[in-house]
């Protein structure tokens, strides 16, 4: 099992993701190598896919959008995202998707 979810000492999570923009619908699509694949309905134009990714993850993780930040991969399909949260069990819930 790939460890695409990394938990820091402060409780925040770093997610390793592979993004497929321009998909029919937004959602998790299983593991893609060492990363979780997420399909986004938003096109990869003017940062729309990045904004949609942050909004999707904020909704899934039940945190404000401001708690989700793109760490790397602004113009790439391979991205690392940080989720600042204190929600117990969130890392396990995310790992269960893959």
UniProtKB/Swiss-Prot annotation:
Belongs to the UPF0235 family. Gene3D superfamilies: YggU-like. GO terms for cellular component: cytoplasm. It holds the Pfam family DUF167. This is UPF0235 protein azo3464. It comes from Azoarcus sp. (strain BH72). It comes from the Bacteria.
